[in-house]
Amino acid sequence: MGSEMCIRDSNNIETVLNLLSNCSIETTPNVYAKYGSFTDLVSTKNNIYVTYLPDEDMNKVIDTAKKLKLEGYSVIPHLPARTITNHEELKKYVQALAEDCGCSKILVIGGGGSQKGNITSSIEILETDLLSKYNFKEVGVACHPEGNPDVKKYDLDNAIIQKNQFSRKADFKMYLATQFFFEAKSLKEWELHLNKLNNNLDIHAGIPGPATLKTLISYATSCGIGNSIRFLSKQALNITKLATIRSPDKLIYDLASYQIENPDTKLKKIHFYAFGGIKKTSEWLKTVNKPDLSYNGLKFE
């Protein structure tokens, strides 16, 4: 992909670098435990999201968040509604993140897997006012530009409307954190739809870091992202490409161009899903943030 792509326009260079300068990366407690520390791996300029998967131990999430904060990172733990068993556990988790870890940012999601307790949605968590009580300053809410196979389109739209309504009375900043996608077209079409819903929340666009085409197809399939599966499958018609590392160069360039061409866009930040490994994504970021270098064809001239 894009091996000949060059960015010569100064506006594009500046926009690409701005998008990448304050981007975020996602990790799991197990990945962090594997390295023991991220100080030599990830720039402290990058926010780090800590996942809370359905089978994860809550204390491991808290411990990972605490250690990352001590290393100087701005940490954004996941708060999955359907994984939390009850409101007492919810309070314990939020309180620990705020008081023990020093977190002031959080991502509220519905959560995968079967429901473990009586909390069914992210809006229920927002309406408890626990995030205000424990002084969270920035709260992301999950969203799906290409839809969610487990949720009806009407319900996805209604969730966007509800979260916008809640944001008007919240005393913290809210934003939309997207599921990953592979084409800028997905974001463009989705934002046009959001405009019809009178969305006023900023968008943090989720995209994959460098990974093999085979790995990306696997993740897209497991998440049921139809448009992305079709897009990747076309590239995989040549079986020799399956093991090829696909980096996000062109997607970043296209998103930067979209930002320039649409000054009213709510797209503000990039979030990386490190499907090919956090080391690979971090190395890619460190390289492309140096304007005199190129990496995998992304050239700043």
Predicted regions and their residues:
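Extended serine/threonine-enriched, polar tracts that run as long, contiguous segments within proteins
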Residues: 25-28, 175-179
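Short, small-residue-biased leader/transition segments that mark boundaries at the very start
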Residues: 1-7
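Glycine- and other small-residue-rich loops at beta-strand/loop junctions that grip anionic moieties
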Residues: 53, 82, 179-180, 208, ...
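Short, surface-exposed basic-aromatic patches at helix termini and helix-loop junctions that form
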Residues: 67-70, 94-99, 191-200, 286-293
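Conserved, mostly hydrophobic/aromatic
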Residues: 77, 163-164, 172, 205, ...
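Active-site beta->alpha loop and helix N-cap motifs at the rims of alpha/beta catalytic domains
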Residues: 8-166
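Active-site glycine- and acidic-residue-rich loops that bind
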Residues: 85-88, 114-121, 152, 178-193, ...
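Active-site pocket-lining/capping segments in soluble small-molecule metabolic enzymes
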Residues: 25-31, 109, 122-146, 161, ...
